[in-house]
UniProtKB/Swiss-Prot annotation:
Key words, A-Z: ATP-binding, Cell inner membrane, Cell membrane, Kinase, Membrane, Nucleotide-binding, Phosphoprotein, Transferase, Transmembrane, Transmembrane helix, Two-component regulatory system
GO biological process, one term: phosphorelay signal transduction system
Organism: Haemophilus influenzae (strain ATCC 51907 / DSM 11121 / KW20 / Rd)
PANTHER family membership: SENSOR HISTIDINE KINASE YKOH, SENSOR PROTEIN QSEC
Name of the coding gene: qseC
Protein name per the record: Sensor protein QseC
GO CC annotation, single: plasma membrane
Source organism phylogeny: Bacteria, Pseudomonadati, Pseudomonadota, Gammaproteobacteria, Pasteurellales
Periplasmic membrane side: 32-162
Sites bearing Phosphohistidine, chain numbering: H244
GO terms for MF: ATP binding; phosphorelay sensor kinase activity
Length: 451
């Protein structure tokens, strides 16, 4: 469909609407004027007939056996000289006794009383004639008016109104054009703002002064710009983080490769370099995997395909999965169910990943011969250990991306807890980390997930 000017379309529609409304109003006005004019003239005819019936003229005509002469007609005619009306007075036998000397003498006698539309002698035009008995039925008075006279008057009144409207039509179009242009000015300003916007500019559009009808569209655009801005920030952060964090592992891999190349016949040195190389590749792979996982989680605005979470099944599956890793490090895994947890919906895979990261951190950073317990209650999931806890300064920073407390012997990326926090946020859970204190002594660390 061809794009057209909104201003032109509005003016056209409004003018056509005004035209049709005017035509309808004109038809109604014509009908009303016609009705009122006929009513007024009918009343005028009745009144004139009453005056003739009550005048001395009736007595004169009854006492005289002949019609009045022309001089008498002229004198009586002067008392009511109106081109709109004609009259005649007949005897009850139909003899014309008196008339206005013009059209009245051509009336065709009708003994019936009341209003009738009829022709007269030597005239094809219709007349509306009022017939009335007078002088105890001895006389018949007829007062008539040509219907064309009425129609001409009605037409003159209606055309007078039409010319006024047609004369005001150009003024109406000019005023409508000015008003529409004025009201569409904020939309044009918005259009210019979008057209002149530079590539990559995701700042919010100005909503001040915009019509209410277009405000939802602009708000949706601003929401889109917000999401786009957040996505670009996440991509830039991901690129920066990946470049920063991969620099050290890649440099270490290069060193190990050089060591292996320089080992010569020293088999033990070469084997050690290759072992370190393998471990470095594993750490780099884990870092990349966690970076990609965190990036995917950051791009999620809301979860889809939710299902009811079976907390007990998820926890028991994780404990079984990590049992041998814990046993190798001489760590005991314990599962405690204090009460039935709240029924929550979510994605089991993500919830399992969240709990796995917490459980892996406890297993990885706890010393040997410690206990890691997973407790389920109605409103909380708690993963607790007795591995000595962390310093209060470090506790505040846990969960920040790439943050790892100083003095850690175990290798890691510092992204595990960030992934935990993001998954919890997507599910509406709250995660907090606390040191376990007993008798004033720090004995361990616990992660509390509030459902």
């Amino acid at each position: 469909m061809k794009n057209r000017s909104l201003t032109l379309r509005l003016i056209s529609v409004l003018c056509l609407t005004a035209l049709f409304v005017w035509l309808g109003s004109t038809l109604v006005a014509w009908w009303q004027v016609r009705h009122d004019v006929n009513k007024v003239f009918d009343a005028q005819q009745v009144l004139f007939a009453e005056r003739l019936a009550n005048s001395d003229l009736s007595t004169i005509l009854l006492e005289s056996s002949t019609t009045l002469n022309k001089n008498s007609q002229s004198v009586l005619k002067k008392s009511y000289d109106d081109d709109a009306l004609a009259f005649a007075i007949f005897s009850k036998t139909g003899k014309l006794l008196f008339s206005d000397g013009r059209n009245g003498k051509d009336f065709i006698f009708n003994y019936k009383t009341g209003f009738y539309n009829a022709n007269i002698y030597d005239d094809d035009d219709k007349w509306r004639i009022f017939w009335r008995m007078a002088a105890n039925g001895e006389l018949v008075i007829a007062v008539g008016q040509e219907l064309d006279y009425r129609e001409d008057l009605i037409e003159e009144m209606i055309l007078g109104q039409m010319w006024i409207w047609f004369a005001s039509l150009p003024i109406l179009i000019i005023v409508l054009g000015w008003l529409i242009h004025k009201e569409l000015r904020p939309i044009k300003r918005l259009s210019q703002e979008v057209q002149t916007r530079k590539s990559g500019d995701v700042s919010l559009l100005n909503t001040e002064g915009l019509p209410v009808e277009i405000l939802p569209l602009v708000k949706n655009l601003n929401q889109f710009f917000d999401r786009t801005s957040a996505m670009l920030q996440r991509e830039r952060r991901f690129t920066s983080d990946a470049a920063h964090e991969l620099r050290s592992p890649l440099a270490a891999l290069r060193i190990q490769i050089e060591v292996a190349q320089l080992a010569g016949d020293d088999v033990a040195l070469r084997e050690q370099a290759l072992l370190h190389l393998t471990q470095g590749i594993d750490r780099a792979s884990q870092l990349i995997e966690q970076l990609l996982t965190l990036s995917r989680l950051d791009n999620l605005q809301a979860l889809e395909t939710l299902q009811l979470l079976d907390w007990e099944a998820i926890v028991q599956s994780l404990i079984s999965e990590r049992y041998f890793v814990a046993e190798k490090r001489k760590i005991t895994l314990v599962f405690e169910k204090e009460s039935e947890p709240k029924q929550k919906q979510g994605q089991s895979i993500l919830v399992s990943l969240m709990l796995r990261n917490l459980l892996d951190n406890a297993i990885k950073y706890c010393p040997e011969d410690t206990i890691v317990s997973v407790k389920i209650s109605s409103s909380q999931i708690i993963i607790e250990d007795n591995g000595g806890g962390v310093e209060p300064e470090d506790l505040k920073k846990l969960g920040q991306r790439f943050y790892r407390p100083a003095g850690q012997n175990e290798k890691g990326s510092g992204l595990g807890l960030s992934i935990v926090m993001r998954i919890a946020e997507l599910h509406g859970f709250k995660v907090r980390l606390e040191n376990v204190v007993k008798e004033g002594r720090r004995i361990g660390l616990k992660a509390i997930i509030s459902l």
